[in-house]
Structure formats: C-alpha cells, structure tokens
Amino acid sequence: MAPARENVSLFFKLYCLTVMTLVAAAYTVALRYTRTTAEELYFSTTAVCITEVIKLLISVGLLAKETGSLGRFKASLSENVLGSPKELAKLSVPSLVYAVQNNMAFLALSNLDAAVYQVTYQLKIPCTALCTVLMLNRTLSKLQWISVFMLCGGVTLVQWKPAQATKVVVAQNPLLGFGAIAIAVLCSGFAGVYFEKVLKSSDTSLWVRNIQMYLSGIVVTLAGTYLSDGAEIQEKGFFYGYTYYVWFVIFLASVGGLYTSVVVKYTDNIMKGFSAAAAIVLSTIASVLLFGLQITLSFALGALLVCVSIYLYGLPRQDTTSIQQEATSKERIIGV
C-alpha cells in the first residue's frame, strides 16, 4: 500500500522512479524483440486490451489490501465506482486518450528502432510542460523553457539520421512510425497532466482512481480492437501469435502503467523525465548488445541533448508537486 502523500519519503520516490525506469527500458527492448522474432505476429490491439484488464485486477487487489476488510472494500467499490457515474465519466477521458496513446506506441515501435523510439518519445516533455502551464496554473522558469527547446533540437537530430540495426532486418515505415509517435506524444502530455490534476484535486484513493480509469479503458480498448482487427481476430483468434515473450511484454506494460500512476500521484510529471532519461540510456545499451545497433554521431549528439534537457527540466525553481490555484497568464507562459 502506498503511503500518504504527505509522508512520502525520498527513498519511496527513488524506489518508484527506479522501478519505472527499469520497466520502461525492459518493455521497449522486449517489445521490439517480440515484433522482430515472432513467426506469427500477434495483434497489438489485443495486447493493449489485456494490459488494461491486468492493471484493473491488480488495482482491485491493492484496493482490497488498502481497505483491510471485505466490508470496507465492498463499501468503497459501491460508493466510488458503482455509485459514481460522474466520476467514471471523468476518468474515461484519460482512459480514452491513453488507449489511443498505447496503440500508437505499439505501431510506432513496430516501425522504429528501439533507441530511436525511446528518444523520439521524449517529445512528451515539452507537450507535458505546455499542458502543465495551461491546465495546472504552474509557472516554468526560463531555464526550463530552454531545456524544452534543447530537447526538440535533440529529437530533431535523432530523426535526421536515425541509428540503423545491422543484425536484425525488418520491413519498417519510418514515416508511419514518426506519425504514430507524434500522436502518442500529444496524448501522453494531455492525459498525464489531466490525470495528475484529478489525482491531486481530491483525497480519493489512488487505486479507486485507477479502477475508475481502467474500467472505461477496457471498454474503449476492446471496442478499438474489434474495429481495427475484428475480421482477422474472428478468423485467427483473440490470442493469435501469443508467446511467452508476448505475455512478458504485457506484464511489463501493466507494471509500468501502475508505477506511472504512483509516480504521478506522489511526485509529478516532471519527475517522470528523470526516469525517461535513464530508460533511454539503458534501452540503447541493450539494443547495441542484442540487435547490433550502430550509433551514429548525430544520434549520439541528439541522445545527449535529450538527456541534458531532461535533467535541466527536472531542476525547477519552485515546488511543482502541488497545484497552484492563482497565476496570471503572463506568469504561466514566461515564469520567473
């Protein structure tokens, strides 16, 4: 059970960020491996749907542990889930956006190298920064804005001449991959800040909020699954192409999603940047060892700029873990 937000220790924050980093790096490499080695390619949409189901089941179990008794557990579900259609509707917004993001992420990674995907995905930082300013009434310092533009420059270098794998040859469509990652980035920025605002605007349990979001998420992803792959699924089956590696990827995605909600609840979206920077390094090293990735100079410089910008962005001059209620338009855009 996660501690109360007021009593969160530095160790707990570091623990969550460390686990989130390792899971993100492992997920990127493992997903890339399944997409390049599978003899029969599975449906990525079904994997996203199953991920939502697993996250829901884990959240239900954690809520039961948090409440401590069957009676309080039933009362909590009845009050906050079954008896709160308004709250379910509120949490359906990020679940819908996250569903789109997850599907776009699967599509992007199928058409991009693992390291390119991981670095390019960091465009969610400037998108998140803008959403934070507009939605949470926070201010960003000039140094933070500089780091945002530095990040854009780094990602541009990565896209200009991306690294190429030499040992694994896979038919890819980079244009489709970058288009999918752009949509995923926009979804990530909005949904992350929206969910943070919902979590920190009330004392409702984190696991209750997760259950509310994942319930609608299952409906959304299941509908999306049959809209995009319905005919093939009926012909080949829902679990077509599934292997132990695919289930491992789904498990990593589920754990990563849960830890992301914990990090957002007890720190903020800015702290997620540190995790992303470390994941870039780890996934790149893994790609070199496993896929024979050749790092070009432009890719290396771009990755370096991304890591430095994420570090600078994570050095705010103010407390960014709580929502400010008052801020002028000028302060929100420029900051001090």
From Swiss-Prot:
Protein name in the entry: CMP-sialic acid transporter
GO biological process: CMP-N-acetylneuraminate biosynthetic process; CMP-N-acetylneuraminate transmembrane transport; N-acetylneuraminate metabolic process
InterPro entries: Nuc_sug_transpt
Family affiliation: Belongs to the nucleotide-sugar transporter family. SLC35A subfamily.
Gene Ontology molecular function: any one: antiporter activity
Annotated keywords: Antiport, Golgi apparatus, Membrane, Sugar transport, Transmembrane, Transmembrane helix, Transport
One Pfam entry name: Nuc_sug_transp
Lumenal face of the membrane: 31-45, 109-114, 161-175, 229-243, 289-296
Phylogenetic lineage: Eukaryota, Metazoa, Chordata, Craniata, Vertebrata
Membrane topology: Multi-pass membrane protein
Positions annotated to bind CMP-N-acetyl-beta-neuraminate: 55, 101-102, 117-124, 188, 210-214, 272
Effect ascribed to mutating Q118A: No effect on CDP-ribitol and CMP-sialic acid transport activity
Organism: Mus musculus (Mouse)
Reported function: Transports CMP-sialic acid from the cytosol into the Golgi apparatus, functioning as an antiporter that exchanges CMP-sialic acid for CMP. Binds both CMP-sialic acid and free CMP, but has higher affinity for free CMP. Also able to exchange CMP-sialic acid for AMP and UMP. Also mediates the transport of CDP-ribitol.
Region span, Disordered: 316-336
Tissue specificity of this protein: Ubiquitous. Found in all the tissues examined including skeletal muscle, brain, heart, liver, kidney and spleen.
